[in-house]
Amino acid sequence: MSFLWEDRAWEDYLYWQVQDKETLKRINALVKDACRTPFSGLGKPEPLRGNLSGYWSRRINEEDRLIYLYENGQLKIIACRGHYED
């Protein structure tokens, strides 16, 4: 499976590289797991609703979520900092 980073998600990822290595490790583990099993596994995956219908969320920590879209065998990472309401 391939994956790609939206611009915002990549900026988030670069932020974590500087700010918090433990959070970065958690994000890496979540991305790896989402590539293997997009709809189950680490971080309590849950489908989003409303204007984010079709997207999925996994918990990085209490405040931050990994938001992604799985489509046609590709994982598209939308954000990895903040919450989906942000």
Task: Report the location of each language-model feature.
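Generic structural signal for secondary-structure transition and capping sites
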Residues: 36-39
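Enriched for short, Lys/Arg-rich terminal
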Residues: 2, 8-24, 29, 42, ...
